[in-house]
A protein has these predicted regions:
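Domain-level signal for soluble alpha/beta catalytic cores
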Residues: 1-277
Length: 277
């Protein structure tokens, strides 16, 4: 069962109202974790049944257990903390009020990352006609979170330069992939909005750099992704989904792929690309 299939999907789905209500109650201490997990299990089971019913060969949990598509994964590592944001992230017409996520020490992998348990539940639904796909933020997406202008000064409290960050980040991903592979994962997807920001007209301002600096960032993003991909088990299929952000049906960036194509399309060693067009 290899991906991509002739008809496929990225893997994130709109949350059912019952799940959104449950998460709000949980965050307000009106619902316990066990009760929230029970509702998540029920809604994921319904989603997987629908995916199979419609003839898809890939099954996902719709990212139903996450607060965001990417930050929850980062919060599962040592050295990372998060707190309620005051400003949010700018999307067109609206700011996404996602938790500020930042270093409080050097990155490290701790056993029992929550996503391993998430995948193990999904993996139970695999059979000879269906493969479970896990979506996680690409290493470049994680790196971007730590080296953007709003974060770099804090990051440099713990690292001398970006190359040091990459070394620890790659090690974290290698350990996570080893654990999720042992749990049965053979289809992993890197979700990656980092390239979308790089093609936007505002990229030089957003990254607070010049043209040469932007080219170096592109090189770093390819490097960190490939360092992880090249260290993964050979029978683990790794695809990537590249987009320009999506929050309440609005976008974070815009622009054609021309500026990043010589880097990501030519050199990134993924099995397949899922692309906006």
């Amino acid at each position: 069962m290899h991906t991509p299939f002739r008809y496929d999907y990225v893997g994130s789905f709109l949350r059912p109202e019952v799940l959104k209500d449950a998460r709000i109650k949980y965050e307000n201490n009106e619902l316990g974790l066990d009760d929230l997990t029970k509702i998540e299990d029920e809604e994921i089971t319904k989603l997987v049944s629908k995916q199979k019913e419609l003839g898809f060969h890939v099954i996902t949990d719709g990212e139903f257990r996450r607060k965001t598509w990417h930050l929850d994964f980062m919060w599962g590592f040592d050295g990372i903390k998060h707190s309620k944001t005051e400003n949010g992230l700018p999307f067109h017409g609206e700011n996404a009020m996602l938790d500020d996520t930042y270093l409080v020490g050097r990155l490290g992998y701790k056993k029992n990352h929550p996503f391993i348990k998430h995948f193990s539940f999904l993996h139970k639904f695999e059979d000879e006609n269906h493969v479970a796909k896990l979506t996680i933020p690409a290493p470049a997406q994680f790196l971007e979170q730590l080296v953007m202008p709003f974060a770099i000064n804090n990051t440099l409290k713990y690292y001398n330069n970006e190359d040091e960050v990459i070394l620890d980040l790659v090690e974290c991903y290698k350990n996570f992939i080893a654990d999720v592979y042992e749990a049965g994962c053979r289809n992993l997807q890197f979700d990656d909005c980092s390239w979308g920001l790089l093609v936007d007209d505002s990229a030089l301002r957003v990254f607070n750099t010049n043209i040469l600096g932007l080219e170096r960032i592109k090189q770093l993003f390819v490097k960190v992704n490939n360092d992880v991909i090249n260290s993964a088990p050979k029978d683990l299929i790794i695809n990537t989904h590249i987009c320009r952000g999506n929050f309440h049906s609005t976008y974070a960036s815009k622009g054609a792929y021309d500026g990043v194509a010589p880097y990501v399309f030519k050199h990134e060693n993924v099995n397949a690309f899922y692309l906006e067009y």
